[in-house]
Amino acid sequence: MPIFSEAANMGGSSILFKKNKSREQMVEVRKLDDFLQQHPSSIGMMKIDVEGFEWEVLQGAEQTMRTYKPKLLIEYSLPLYNQISPDHGRKIYQFLTSIYGHIRNVGLDHEIDQKVESFEDLEPLTHHTNLWCTND
């Protein structure tokens, strides 16, 4: 699968968005669920920051997440998701709430700590943030 990047900001590489990217290279993409079937291991915590590819990563890790219920820190970008489709951010939020009982908006550098009780709590976001998802 191609990944698009620019030398000045490798952290902004994207599988979904080619705009303003000067470099393209092929990368192997595997589902976490498939990897763990071949290499069994317990998962206690996950960090997902994949520049708009969150839904696909969550789908590829669904069995793992439902089985182990790892704590999750996920970058969440409603403005980016709205470029994909108007309901994309809601779909991700609903998936997270189907697994996790507690979701908190902790900001980019953990400068905030707000309980997220509904999707409407996320709708005012004008930039990306991190969500901390747990069951305790």
Segments and roles (model prediction):
Residues 1-41:
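Glycine-rich adenosyl-binding loop in Rossmann-like folds that engage adenosine-containing cofactors
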Residues 34-136:
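Conserved acidic-Pro-Pro-aromatic motif
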